[in-house]
Amino acid sequence: MPQRQLQAELTKLLDSGNYADAMPFFDELIISGQDDPDINYENIVIGSPMVFPSGYMQSYAKTMDSSYITKAAEFCGSFVGKYPDHPQAIKLLQMQDTFLRMDQKWNEAVQVIEKLLDPAQAFRKKIEEEGKRSEMLNLYLGRAQCYHTLQNWVKGAVAFRELLTRADQARDEDKAAYAISCLTEMFVVTKRVDEVFPLLPRLSEETPARYDMRLNVNLMQGGDQLKEKGRFVEASLLYALTMTAEEVKNYYTERIARITAEKDRLSVFLKNPNLPKRRLAILRDKDNGLTMKLTTAKSHLAIAEKTASFTTNLRWSKASNFQDTKRFWESFWGFYWLYKEDPENELAEDFIYAAFASANTVKFTEKSIELGEQYLANKNWLKYGSDVTNIMANAYRLEAENQAAIAEGLQTALSTLDKEKAARAKQNSEEQYQRFFELCDRFLEKDPGNKYAVNFVNMMGSVYFKQRKFDQLLEKFAGYVAGVPDANKGYINNQSFAEGPAMPSALYLSGISLLSTGKFEEAKPLLAPIVGVYVEGLPLADGTLSNMSQDEEVVDE
């Protein structure tokens, strides 16, 4: 292309602010300058240094090719190295820092920032003389970001505190929030959790800094540290502030969409050929700023997507911490929804058991039965089978007694509605008792040597005594059928049961039942192994057999 045409096209592109398309023309000027002594390419560069990084960034914005960021950073550093006194040197160093951070070259970026903030160099003095406080604040922010990313807590401690001081002076809440998030993470990682608490009120504000992935992971770890020390209330504060990986992903996905939409709207204005140069320059700076925000948001999203989900661990920690602080209802619902929303999790058995046990703690019988039945229905779950069956049986027993009491209270009712209610309560009571005995019998048949066998025998004995169904107790425990003992029936005649811990209880309850029905001689062989003495004609205190409520209380205990 002829030199005159080349310069004309280049001037036209530069005037329109289209620096990206102007870059090939500069390359051609370099080639032309090798043969034409009238073309001084170096003077062209010195006269318009901002064109080159701006052109590279426009190319990056169009293609998202990160090599353009690298080229932009290299140009800025090279130019300032040659011309440190150039009027645009500070601006170019600031741009170099921005590009290096976009390219995630944190060590190189922080060196540039430290150079700009060094009181011994002219750069800082010039910035302060010109009163560019916002530029200084951005430098402090950049330095903090670099040390935070590098996890350099020694230098970071100074950088974070200085950023917080400067941000507070400028009343910049976003930058102050970021400084606080950095300090919080530093204190947790270095196990100085107590120093986090003065910062907590400021961490509750909705800013991008709150959605930093590492900050939230460390908040959870800080809560774990406090929980291990028994400081449950303080741990709950950190757990409450922790964002999950999914929340971080959603936030940055929405943020990327918002920034992209804003860039698209801005690009429409940038295409207007009639914009004044000053206005065009302002819009291009804003577009570059949005490009950096977009790159940062995408970087955060990438980190969140690579981070293994810790939602389950967080929810478990919250629920168990509620339990430790005796907030039992919150603990129950925490465990309950943890299981319900992820029933296929490899830890589902632990989830459902925790929810089941919590339901029993708060005496939520309906949920206790619901969860217990679901646990027992899964034949692969064996870890807590004994505990669940024991608690379930007791829950059915209590509910059956409750329904029986309702039915008894309405026996003399006259209204049809009350009579129907009494009938339903009676039927419910019978169904609950039926399920209670099924669980007890199944457990004792399967594992008569288990420590819980005593509980099942005592619970059944309690029910039989309250209902005065001694014949049924004797048939089940001692093998009495129609008043005649059968050596092939009854728990006490089962060798496996006889060797287990529940044998004394079964003998005692069977013996007392025989006494209650007037069969004193038949009761003696059953009671003798328990008291250790066999005395013929053993006198019984008056009222021992008649006061059944007293016997029932003993059995319950």
Please tell me what each predicted stretch does.
Residues 1-557:
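Acidic, polar-rich low-complexity tracts and alpha-helical solenoid repeat scaffolds
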